[in-house]
Design a protein with these regions (language model features):
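Active-site catalytic motif of lipid deacylating hydrolases and related acyltransferases
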Residues: 2-70, 107-125, 206-211, 228
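Gly/Ala-rich beta-loop-alpha elbow adjacent to hydrolase catalytic centers
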Residues: 76-80, 84
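Short alpha-helix in the alpha/beta-hydrolase fold that links the catalytic acid
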Residues: 18, 188-197
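Short beta-strand/loop motif that positions the catalytic acidic residue
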Residues: 178-180
Length: 232
C-alpha cells in the first residue's frame, strides 16, 4: 500500500520524513510531495498561479506512481489537507478511490468559504500568525526565517484562490480520517458537522496541542493510521 503526503503552507516533503522512519505494518511505500516553486531566480520552475493548478500538479505526481495496481491513501497537513482532499475527489471520479484521505489540522473543505475572510489577510502580520501557529524552529536564523515567511505568504495567497464545491450524491469520498489539536487557532469547531458533507465515513482524533500538534504525537498518529488501514 502506498501513502502520499502533502505538506503545510511554507513546508516541504522532508518535514514529514518521520513517516518514512516509522515501521508501518500495512504501508509499504511512502512518498512526500514538494510543491512546484520558483525557489531561485535562475530556476525554470514556475510558481503555481492558483489552487486548482496546485491540485492538478499533485494529481499528476500521484498518478506517476502507478496507483492502479494497489490501494493507496493520501495525507495532508494544514493547506496540504485541502490538496489531499481535492486530489482524492478527482481521482475517485476516475475509479481510483483512495482507501482514506487523512486530513490533519484543517477544517471541512466545504466550510472554507465561510472562513475565507479570516485567512485572506493573515500574511499582513505574518510574524503574529507564525507565533499563533507554533511549531516553528526558534533557532532559525534570519535568512532562513525570511525564506520561510516568503513561502508561507505565497501559499496563503494561493489558498485564497481555493473554491471547494459541495459534493453531490455519489461524489463524496468514501472515508476521511481527521487529526487535529484541541488548541489550534485556525480551526472552527462550529463547522465540524460539515465533515459529513465531504465523506460517507469520518473518524476523528483530537490531541492536546496547537496547529503543529503532530510533531509531539507523531508516533501515535502513525500508529492510528496503520490501525485504520488495517481496519482496526
Amino acid at each position: 500500500m502506498k501513502l502520499f503526503i502533502f505538506p503545510h503552507s511554507g513546508g516541504f516533503g522532508h518535514n514529514y520524513n518521520f513517516f518514512k522512519k516509522y515501521q508501518f505494518e500495512n504501508i509499504d511505500e511512502i512518498y512526500a510531495y514538494d510543491y512546484p516553486r520558483k525557489l531561485r531566480p535562475e530556476s525554470k520552475v514556475k510558481d503555481e498561479r492558483n489552487f486548482l493548478e496546485r491540485v492538478r500538479n499533485a494529481i499528476e505526481w500521484v498518478l506517476s506512481h502507478d496507483i492502479k495496481s494497489e490501494e493507496y491513501l493520501l495525507f495532508g497537513h494544514s493547506l496540504g489537507a485541502f490538496v489531499a482532499y481535492e486530489v482524492g475527489m478527482e481521482l475517485k471520479k476516475h475509479g481510483l478511490n483512495p482507501l482514506t484521505v487523512i486530513m490533519s489540522s484543517q477544517n471541512p473543505p466545504v466550510s472554507f468559504p465561510k472562513v475565507r475572510k479570516d485567512f485572506e489577510n493573515l500574511y499582513i502580520d505574518i510574524d503574529y500568525f507564525i507565533e499563533r501557529l507554533g511549531g516553528t524552529n526558534c533557532n532559525m536564523n534570519k535568512k532562513s526565517m525570511d525564506f520561510y515567511k516568503s513561502l508561507l505568504i505565497s501559499d496563503l495567497k494561493l489558498l485564497g484562490t481555493y473554491y471547494p464545491k459541495i459534493p453531490q450524491k455519489g461524489e463524496k469520498l468514501d472515508d476521511i480520517t481527521i487529526f487535529c489539536g484541541d488548541d489550534d487557532p485556525v480551526l472552527y469547531p462550529e463547522y465540524w458537522g460539515e465533515w459529513d458533507l465531504c465523506s460517507s465515513s469520518c473518524e476523528k482524533f483530537t490531541y492536546h496541542g496547537t496547529h503543529f500538534y503532530i510533531y509531539q504525537y507523531k508516533e501515535d498518529v502513525m500508529k492510528k493510521i496503520d490501525q485504520h488501514v488495517k481496519g482496526g
